[in-house]
Amino acid sequence: MRLRHVVSSLDLTRDDYFRIFELADKFSNVKKLNYLSGKVVSLAFFEPSTRTAQSFHTAAIKLGADVIGFASEESTSIAKGENLADTIRMLNNYSNCIVMRHKFDGAALFASEISDIPIINAGDGKHEHPTQALIDLYTIYKVFGEIDGRTFGLLGDLKYARTVNSLLRALTRFKPKKVFLISPSQLKVRREILDGLNYPVIETENPYDVIQDIDVLYVTRIQKERFVDEVEYEKVKESYVVDLKLVNMMKKDGIILHPLPRVTEIDRKVDKTTNAKYFYQASLAVPLRMALFYEVLGERKDD
């Protein structure tokens, strides 16, 4: 069954995740295919992006699709006063799928409710980033061969990081042993996210108390652009630094992930450790997003 919109991690079933992982494996060494020949993908990035925009662009091209779009709100008619609904309707006329990033929470859901073509959420405000969660889980699957039964530690900005929200929600499709939420009190996971989880969660402010139990340490930067009050940002901006001291306390086969960009929250000396998998994680973005495009737009025998 073809996927329609991918607005939230909860739009995917457990079977969907594994099917996309299997497809990503098949696409991992592909140079160029024509599966999406004749299709047009719109990259509607109302908010800046480097990795996400470029990896989606590359994924579409490698499947044979044509790509149109924009990289900032300033380059669109929204800068002239056009509303989001009209922009989405216009993009429906030009393309077969819209990959959308926006600064407002819920923008992707709003777009999906008025769009006749699939919407893929590439990040909406501090709400969600479901394709990043797909990459995160795919990395874990590739490293360990499984996701169930693992202990996770999410560290850093757990309040404003949309990648955290999507990963926590995606994990409801699996069976994590437990999840440690490690953050300053000002940056704890929001209650509406916690209330929807179906696995054990433990909140703490000290990573040293739990690091020895963690299989997957997921690190996020403190997101200055989400803070209304810069004074509050200054208080927490360097709350944690993952350094060699912390890494040396991890399990030997434990891994460190990061959605990137990294600022100061992971010491660069950590990059050379066997635990550091964040650059490998980033390398999986293109085949994973190829798989997602194929799920949304590819021809199916059951269509």
UniProtKB/Swiss-Prot annotation:
Gene3D superfamilies assigned to the protein according to its UniProt record, in alphabetical order: Aspartate/ornithine carbamoyltransferase (3.40.50.1370)
Pathway membership, UniProt: Pyrimidine metabolism; UMP biosynthesis via de novo pathway; (S)-dihydroorotate from bicarbonate: step 2/3
Residues that hold L-aspartate according to the record: 80, 162, 221
One MF annotation (Gene Ontology) recorded for this entry: amino acid binding
PROSITE patterns, sorted: CARBAMOYLTRANSFERASE
Protein name in the entry: Aspartate carbamoyltransferase catalytic subunit
EC number(s) reported in the record: 2.1.3.2
InterPro entries found in the cross-reference section: Asp/Orn_carbamoyltranf_P-bd, Asp/Orn_carbamoylTrfase, Asp/Orn_carbamoylTrfase_sf, Asp_carbamoyltransf, Asp_carbamoyltransf_Asp/Orn-bd
Signal peptide bounds: none
Binding-site list for carbamoyl phosphate: 51-52, 101, 129, 132, 260-261
Similarity comment: family membership: Belongs to the aspartate/ornithine carbamoyltransferase superfamily. ATCase family.
Reactions catalysed, as given in the entry: carbamoyl phosphate + L-aspartate = N-carbamoyl-L-aspartate + phosphate + H(+)
UniProt feature coiled coil, ranges: none
